Amino acid sequence: MAMTDPIADMLTRIRNAGLAKHQKCDMPASNVKLAIVNVLKELGYIKNFKQISDDKQGILRIYLKFDNENKHIIHAIDRVSTPGCRVYVGKDEIPVVKNGLGNAILSTSKGVMHDAAAREAQLGGEVLCSVW
């Protein structure tokens, strides 16, 4: 059976690996996933990532980040826009996650970026997920 939402699958893999205290998690790679993971690294939610080539589409390996008490840095990572219900926002309607403690990740005409960068560039787009 084909996967209907690969981004939700990626977020679930990150969430489950963090709850299980794994240091890394692997998943099939794609350009959108790579862009989302790049934003997560820029925001400091993950340590690092690398793309491993194989015979198919490649593997994306994400190294998770934990605090001093060995708790996962990401408290919650949720999909907002799904294939069945897309959520688009204008430049003035970009959501504030947890009163500014979290971040929303958007897909805009200038690429995938976090909510603060989209507000600064005055761009709206599709709200892919929220992280805090």
Swiss-Prot record:
Which Pfam families does the annotation name? Ribosomal_S8
Any Gene Ontology CC annotation:
ribonucleoprotein complex
What sections of the sequence does the record tag as coiled-coil?
none
UniProt keyword annotation of ATP-binding present: no
For this chain, the annotated S-S bridges are: none
Top-level taxon:
Bacteria
Q: For this protein, what is any one GO molecular function term? A: structural constituent of ribosome
Which InterPro entries does this chain map to? Ribosomal_uS8, Ribosomal_uS8_CS, Ribosomal_uS8_sf
GO biological process, any: translation
Identify the keywords attached in UniProt to this record, alphabetized: Ribonucleoprotein, Ribosomal protein, RNA-binding, rRNA-binding
SUPFAM superfamilies hit by this protein: Ribosomal protein S8
Query: What is known about its subunit structure?
Result: Part of the 30S ribosomal subunit. Contacts proteins S5 and S12.
Entries under NCBIfam families matching the protein: PRK00136.1
Q: Which family does it belong to?
A: Belongs to the universal ribosomal protein uS8 family.
Query: What this chain does, per the record?
Result: One of the primary rRNA binding proteins, it binds directly to 16S rRNA central domain where it helps coordinate assembly of the platform of the 30S subunit.
- Stated name of the protein: Small ribosomal subunit protein uS8
List the gene name.
rpsH
